[in-house]
Design a protein with these regions (language model features):
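A short alpha-helical cap/connector motif
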Residues: 2-7, 11-145, 152-173, 177-221
Length: 221
């Protein structure tokens, strides 16, 4: 009798394990309402992003960096009308994080806020209308992901203000580090950003070879 009960119990546990595995698999593969809203917005506006927004391939790269490293505390310098912010916040909606994004132009800021609402991502974004030159040094942090896509002549200054607020393992990215010929921006065109971050021993920097190029720097210590 005991053997029969043991057999039934084992069968029950096996069935429970199989069912649980299927349920988890289905949950991971399920498309959320936010996923649907974001995909619809990105598709509907695919050829209408202007005002210095990132191309889709770069947005996807930002998304992947956050998901792969489970980043949660993000900062964006230069919102524009929200394309990159949507990709970043979409990833943060899955990791449980939040984005602070800063834009100085009122019209672009207001359009970005509307786009965030359409994408269903507003609760994951703290959008601020401000001068990043003044605001970034005042932010407390810490941050584990940063995306810089604003005035190129200030990139190094942004980096200097942000680096002390980066956690170990954090990722600092900067857009448009290539010139129109596909070469690294140097001298006046790049304002020394790449040279600066590559000179820091505690940063490991590579460049994602997209249209404009994204410098990706990981803080090792």
């Amino acid at each position: 009798m005991r053997t029969k009960r043991t057999g039934i119990l084992l069968l029950f546990l096996v069935c429970l394990f199989i069912f649980s595995g299927q349920a988890v698999s289905q949950e991971v593969g399920q498309e959320t309402e936010i996923d649907k809203k974001v995909k619809n917005l990105l598709q509907d506006t695919k050829y209408r992003w202007r005002d210095m927004n990132v191309p889709e391939v770069d947005g996807q790269k930002l998304y992947d960096l956050i998901i792969e490293n489970n980043y949660k505390k993000a900062l964006e310098v230069g919102t524009s009308t929200g394309h990159s912010g949507i990709w970043i916040a979409w990833a943060l909606s899955k990791t449980g994080g939040k984005l602070i994004t800063v834009e100085i132009d009122k019209d672009r800021y207001e359009e970005a806020v509307k786009n965030f609402e359409k994408a269903g991502l507003s609760k994951f974004i703290d959008a601020r209308l401000a001068d990043a030159h003044e605001l970034i040094p005042e932010l407390e942090g810490p941050f584990d992901f940063v995306f810089i896509d604003a005035d190129k002549n200030w990139y190094t200054n942004y980096a200097k203000a942000v680096i002390p607020k980066l956690e170990k393992g954090a990722c600092m990215t900067a857009h448009n580090v290539y010139d129109s010929s596909g070469r690294f921006r140097r001298g006046r065109s790049g304002h020394g950003y790449l040279e600066y971050v590559k000179s820091l021993s505690f940063l490991e920097t590579t460049v994602f070879s997209s249209g404009g190029g994204i410098a990706i720097s990981y803080k090792k210590e």
